[in-house]
Structure formats: C-alpha cells, structure tokens
Amino acid sequence: MYRYSAADYSRTMLYENSEGLDLGAISSDGRWVVYARNNSNADTDLFLIDVAASELELVNITPHEGNIEYASMGFTPDSRQFIYSTNEFGEFSQAWTLSLDTGARQVLIAEDWDVMYVGYSPSGRYRVSGINNVARTVVTLKDLTTGRDIVLKNVPEGDLAQVRFNRDESAIAFGLYRDTAPYDV
C-alpha cells in the first residue's frame, strides 16, 4: 500500500501486503487501514494498521474461535471508530463499532435481519443503513443530532444501494436495483 502526493505524484510505501489480505477500509484521515483475511466462506479475520505509528503492526481486531464472519463497513467521519459487521452473536449480521481510542466495542445496529451497510454524511450528522429484510433492502436515514429518521419521498420501488451525500449534506445520490429495470443512479 502506497500513499501518493497529489502535488507531484511521489509515493511512500506504507505497508507491504505479503499475506495476501483484502483491503477492507481506510479512514478519512488516512491514519487507519483495515484488511480482511477470508479463512473460509464462514470465517473471517479483520486486521488493523495504524500507518501513523513509528513501527507498523498488523493487529488482529477480531480474535475468535470457530466460524465467525466479520466484514469491514468503514469508519466514522471523525476516524475515531471502526464499523464492522459480524454474525458472532446470532443468526443475523449486526453492525458494531470499535473505538480506536479505547478498544471498546459496542453494538451499533442489531435487527432481525442482516445489516448490509452503514455509512455517514461528511460531517457525521446523518447515518444511513441498509437491512436485508426478506430479500429487500430497507434503508434508514437517521439525523443523529435529533435522533429522528428522515423519510425519503418520491423514491421508486426497489433496493437502494451506495447512498452518498453531497458535501453540504443537502442532497443524496443512490443506486436503485429493481426487478423490472437495470440498475439506475
């Protein structure tokens, strides 16, 4: 993994991935990197690297026994928490946070179906999540300052994916999967 300068395209190697791990996520401040190792179709490990440390260390942040799946969902906008999904606590995948300051873990979203994704607006005011509910993705957009869900109006029937906010958070873009039409933005 290299860090490139946008000014002159010079590069600095941050980490040599000799283990053949899959890139999971990079924090918005560029300090944290998560890699995944698929041990089988039912067992995954996640590894964290602090690229600002004087000595880079690949830390397994999901030590476990048995078949447990973990997947990277990204970081909070302030780069202080890593978000991941796991089926460690039941049949369905839940979204959890890992505090990068303290190492504390906390459930973020747990439903009666799999949590498919979690994302944030640039400032962190809004959180979007998708839950797979009987082969349909139920999307929730929450204003974290009020705790209220935002109702999306005039959205065609289908599954919303890859929800993105513009910089001032006044609009969103998303992809839409429908069984009667191809994927549309």
Model-predicted regions and their roles:
Residues 1, 12, 16-37, 42-46, ...:
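Conserved beta-propeller blade repeats
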Residues 1-2, 41-48, 91-96, 135-141, ...:
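Structural motif
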Residues 5-9, 50-54, 99-103, 143-147:
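Short loop/turn segments that connect beta-strands within beta-propeller blades
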Residues 6, 38-40, 51-52, 87-89, ...:
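Short polar/acidic secondary-structure junctions
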Residues 54-58, 185:
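Predominantly five- to eight-bladed beta-propeller fold
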Residues 138-139, 143, 163-166:
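Short hairpin/turn module used for nucleic-acid contact or packing/dimerization
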